[in-house]
Design a protein with these regions (language model features):
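Active-site loop-to-helix "anion-binding N-cap" substructures in soluble metabolic enzymes
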Residues: 1-117
């Protein structure tokens, strides 16, 4: 499988960017263009203006963040669709909405931007 990935990377050149979260196994890391935490990888995705396809070897929220930050013509792909993060799933919708209401009541509606994990 690694040889096939390397072959595809060679064929696609700058049209392909592979990002791997630092917890990925050594084989995935060996074919990644960048390895790091979710913030660093999102920044690398945003800075890249040549790749048509960005493969994000991480979990849903990481790929979603990269997709928000990249250009409309760039496609962010998550190779393992079942990849999830227990921390990202800790708060349910009711809890998130309650927290949002508390923040709005304390700081106002217009200047509050919650940043979540």
């Amino acid at each position: 499988m690694l040889n096939k990935i390397k072959e595809i990377k060679k064929e696609m050149g700058d049209d392909l960017l592979i990002l791997a979260h630092h917890y990925q196994n050594d084989q995935i890391v060996s074919v990644a263009d960048y390895v790091g935490d979710s913030l660093k990888l999102a920044q690398m995705a945003e800075k890249n203006k040549t790749a048509k396809y960005i493969v994000f070897c991480g979990v849903h929220f990481m790929a979603e963040t990269a997709d928000i930050l990249t250009e409309d013509w760039q496609k962010v792909l998550l190779p393992a669709l079942t990849a999830g993060c227990p921390m990202a799933n800790m708060a349910d919708l009711d809890q998130a909405e309650k927290a949002w209401e508390l923040l709005k009541a304390e700081f106002g509606d217009e200047e509050t931007v919650p940043v979540t994990y």
